[in-house]
Amino acid sequence: MEGADLLTAGVLFLFAAVAAVPLAARLGIGAVLGYLLAGIAIGPWGLGFISDVDEILHFSELGVVFLMFIIGLELNPSRLWQLRRSIFGVGAAQVLLSAAVLAGLLMLADFLWQAAVVGGIGLAMSSTAMALQLMREKGMNRSESGQLGFSVLLFQDLAVIPALALVPLLAGSADEHFDWFKVAMKVLAFAVMLIGGRYLLRPVFRFIAASGVREVFTAATLLLVLSAALFMDALGLSMALGTFIAGVLLAESEYRHELENAIDPFKGLLLGLFFISVGMSLNLGVLYTHLLWVAASVVILVVIKMLTLYLLARVYGIRSSERMQFASVLSQGGEFAFVLFSTASSQRLFQGDQMALLLVTVTLSMMTTPLLMKGIDKWLSRRLNGPEENDEKPWVEDDKPQVIVVGFGRFGQVIARLLMANKMRITVLERDIGAVNLMRKYGYKVYYGDATQVELLRSAGAEAAESIVITCNEPEDTMKLVALCQQHFPHLHILARARGRVEAHELLQAGVTQFSRETFSSALELGRKTLVSLGMHPHQAQRAQLHFRRLDMRMLRELIPEHSDMVQISRAREARRELEEIFQREMQQERRQLDGWDEFE
């Protein structure tokens, strides 16, 4: 693709995303489906603005690559070892069972048995990009079903290697094309990558971080991710698997959070590009000529995978309320099918339109998942939140609460308990089904749902409430909810949880002045107790704590425009000197006056 064409394609992608995704979000069908529809609109079977779909689809896989790197950063080798049962137990069972059933059905549809085996394996895989995005949106990341879903996806990525090796064997060309020496060299190169990464990555990043130039650190992070992806691609393996391993190797390093911050903006844009490319690849010509076949295939694929996943979740011990979410989020075909089916086509395993039919089935199955998840969310909301005797009542029965608490993790629980102990009327919204079920057993009024949906907030009593307390785990959800409340419920007094200084700056920029940094207050309190244990008078230690809090908040406000700049470092040094001067100035006065306590802002 020429430079000018690439620029034109980039503009079209951005325009399609900006136009389609907000519209999809407004319709309540989710960003992923919006990207897919945008791809159909600008692709060769839509308005025809872009025709070179294969090249763009290959490039857009970088979105999945960046996503897997960030996921790897959130794990570590010991955590992976803990997940071994779910990865190699449930993951392997899902692939083998689904592939066997689907291959049998393809044979009944006049596929050669070799093509049916490849088709069954490809259809058994799920979309890593879509499933992880939806799990994040639905708050499944930290739930048991979310962890199991991740394990299944990880096994599917690992299964790429033997699946690709199987294609030439099934094509009957093992003697001509299948070289065991090349396979051994690939395994050796893979081992070298593991060992080299284990011992070289941290020293390299330590050297780069010592330069103090943020842009160089970002460039080094991009270099690592892209190099790992290209290396694995050259070996004929999954690019996403390579970057996932690189992330795991750095998961225990001191640079984990900085790496994640450097990659995150690129991940979001490239994931959007990936979904647009998938939409562009939808062959509407095959869909029109084989409409009934494709429609039946999509339904059968989704139903078989959901049944398999639901049964495995039941055997594994997942709560009944979480099984449907787990089964539906992995029910689609995946991006790996495009790679596997292309390889099989080059080996002439498929006949006629068979490959095109399978790819259309995979693409359409990906489009069903957001709608399926939305329907299951509504069903779960009514089942979990609706009163048993009268289903006609709204899902959230507290129509006039004083306070709405969003999120019922450890942070939110403390706040809710304090409010309830003081006879305040509260409504708690939580999107982790397991947490909802558990807390209801203890008598808490907790309701299931995604608080970033305006209708749920309205039914929860946001129009009558005085305050909303936001305790979401994800900073993106917090900021989205803040914007939502400011737009639709401007009367609400917003109080929020900030995980650190960066999020605190974002809240201040958004106009939220009442927030609590979760580790800051507890750290200050422990610091005060430490001063007392070292012999400082309790009153003097309390004043030191209050001065520190006041100065830190002032510095936080002053540094809003430069919260990601090196200015913070010099300002922090000035603040430390200023704090020392305050303490020295007041030391003598505090020794004479040890009664009474200061109020602070």
UniProtKB/Swiss-Prot annotation:
Keywords for the protein's UniProt record, in alphabetical order: Antiport, Cell inner membrane, Cell membrane, Ion transport, Membrane, Potassium, Potassium transport, Transmembrane, Transmembrane helix, Transport
Any GO CC annotation of this UniProt entry: plasma membrane
One MF annotation (Gene Ontology) recorded for this entry: glutathione-regulated potassium exporter activity
A biological-process GO annotation: proton transmembrane transport
Membrane topology classification: Multi-pass membrane protein
Segments passing through the bilayer: 4-24, 29-49, 55-75, 87-107, 111-131, 152-172, 177-197, 207-227, 230-250, 262-282, 284-304, 324-344, 356-376
Keyword Membrane: yes
Localization annotation: Cell inner membrane
Domain RCK N-terminal: from-to ranges: 400-519
UniProt key word Metal-binding: no
HAMAP family: K_H_efflux_KefB
PANTHER family: K(+) EFFLUX ANTIPORTER 3, CHLOROPLASTIC (PTHR46157:SF4)
Family under the similarity heading: Belongs to the monovalent cation:proton antiporter 2 (CPA2) transporter (TC 2.A.37) family. KefB subfamily.
Role, per record: Pore-forming subunit of a potassium efflux system that confers protection against electrophiles. Catalyzes K(+)/H(+) antiport.
Subunit structure: Interacts with the regulatory subunit KefG.
UniProt-recorded name of the protein: Glutathione-regulated potassium-efflux system protein KefB
The organism of origin for this protein: Salmonella newport (strain SL254)
